Design a protein with these regions (language model features):
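Helix-turn-helix DNA-binding elements, focusing on the entry/boundary residues of the two helices
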Residues: 8, 19-20, 35, 50-53
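Positions in alpha-helical segments
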Residues: 6, 10, 36-39, 75-76
Length: 112
């Protein structure tokens, strides 16, 4: 398992945000914390609750939460692909979606 606080700090710094700025950004999600709370998360003195963590992930563009905070996700179909392989797979998915041939069928409600 990866260090939660270090991971948050890394992504915050990658986004060029100060702890105080992250605290302000969280207000968009009705989450009100002080910069020292962000500091406590990053230093491991405390941890964000699930709602706070999900908002942090959204703000810091963390999309694969499992991989980012725990490690290699056994359910990730891309887990054994390098970056180029992932890119090609995503390109193919995009082509399938654009074709319209593989859309999920809409179920029309039947009123009896």
């Amino acid at each position: 398992m990866k260090d939660l606080g270090k991971t948050i700090a890394k992504h915050r710094k990658d986004h060029k945000l100060k702890q105080s700025q992250l605290a302000i950004e969280l207000e968009k999600y009705d989450i009100y914390v002080k910069p020292n709370t962000v500091s406590a998360w990053e230093s491991g003195l405390s941890q964000p609750n699930s709602r706070q963590l999900l908002a942090i992930c959204e703000l810091l563009d963390i999309h694969d939460i499992y991989t980012e905070f725990i490690g290699k996700n056994p359910d990730n179909p891309f887990r054994n692909l390098n970056e180029e392989g992932v890119r090609k797979a995503l390109d193919y998915i995009s082509l399938l979606e654009k074709s319209g041939d593989y859309k999920i069928a809409e179920v029309i409600p039947l009123h009896v």
